[in-house]
Amino acid sequence: MANDQNRREAEALTALARALAASRPDMEPTLREIEGLAAAALGRPAPIEVERGFEQAARRLRTGWLRSVAAETARVLRSPTEREIERLAHSRHDAYGYERDFQPESLEARCEAFFGPAPPGWTAAHVMFSSGQAALATVLLHLGERRRGKLEVAHVGSYFETRELVARACAPARNATDADCIIVEPMACDGRFTRHDPARLARRLTRGQVLVVDETLSAPATQAPAILAEAVAGGAAVLRLVSGLKLLQQGLELANVGIVSVFATEADLAASLADGLKRCRTLTGAGLRFVDALALEAPFFLDREATETYAGRVFAHNAALAQAVMARNRRFKPLGGAGLAGAAMPYCAFELEAGNGVEGLEALACRIEDEATARGLLIERGGSFGFRGHRFEVIEPETGEPPFLRIALGARDDHSCSGLIELMGRLAQGGAEMRPRWRPAGGGLHPE
């Protein structure tokens, strides 16, 4: 079984390399290197060494692609000459007069095939930004343009940067009914996962209101069809927001990107919102840079089948982790409410039932490191989620919420994935005292 799983990862990496080499001929040397690294990894005796070989191959693939992209973009100034603009116009890339006004029309056109057409009676437009948060900030800027006072926003979710952005730029609405804009996270996490129902909010929209649905934690799956099936009032709009860095790039993190899909039953409203977002994008520099757009020309980005397969493995592995922990749990608080049954989560978040502080969580993190080393499991300290390999970190929110341990299992179905699931199930039972390699000193945590 393990050999089959390793062969699948080797084949996946070489398939990605072949796709990139087909797109850029100067990637041929990288393709040959990846083929060699993948084959060498398969020949290593220890499972952890096999996985390290795959990690090396993935990093080399990313490096080769970004080096190729950088070599091309280095030949074009950020304010190109007329001759350079003409040359770009005759290439497969989007031309631009100055980079802050770069319009990634080719990538935005690919969004319709990826996300699918708008339902009957709806018009859709897709706008890309330099990140998910840049996208949201631009949305709030544009929506507030014609308001006499501050834009009134209701935030139904947990993401701390969204909360801070709304607090800095907008006025909090007393409730969703009174809000100019409602931001909802269908899957939210602040140490515990919570589900929210955007369709219920859509039913209550009135003319002039905008519902922003942040699906970053659940992409590429979407609730848009269910939301748009509601009797949304004319003159209201629904915007879907996705950060494309996490689960849409096969774990390679080629470039930050945020995607806003604008839906309205009135074609003029959809066009006006999309055009306004694009203009604000130029004014604030919130758009993609030319080098980012070329990096995102990777054929697997916005490939529906490839993305669903990849993200599906991430969700499945973290679901298995959650189930293993909860089945034997005597150490952690519940991961979330009963409404989470069957929910897809791209990582797991754990709070200790007793003594949930940074010191206790750090002690647990050190125990995980020790046990992983003893068992030959590959997991690294680091943030975010959606990688090919596995990560974990202790998070202490700046906003005052309780700290928590995040474990983000990746897409690789490897020895470490199954081993970490088994390890966390055992640790969830409690029992043996965890002696930290860290001790409090001078108000902080310091190594022994």
What are these regions (language model features)?
Residues 1-168, 326-327, 443-447:
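Conserved N-terminal alpha-helix of the aminotransferase class I/II PLP-enzyme fold
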Residues 17-24, 39, 43-64, 233-400, ...:
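Active-site C-terminal subdomain of aminotransferase-like
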Residues 100, 128, 155, 185, ...:
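Glycine- and other small-residue-rich loops at beta-strand/loop junctions that grip anionic moieties
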Residues 119, 143-148, 173-174, 199-206, ...:
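Alpha-helix termini
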Residues 137, 141, 194-202, 414-429:
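Amphipathic, non-transmembrane alpha-helical secondary structure
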Residues 138-142, 161-168, 193-196, 219-227, ...:
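A short acidic (Asp/Glu
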Residues 154-158, 184-188, 214-217, 351-353, ...:
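Structural motif
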Residues 171-231, 237, 243-247:
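Active-site phosphate-binding strand-loop segment of PLP-dependent enzymes
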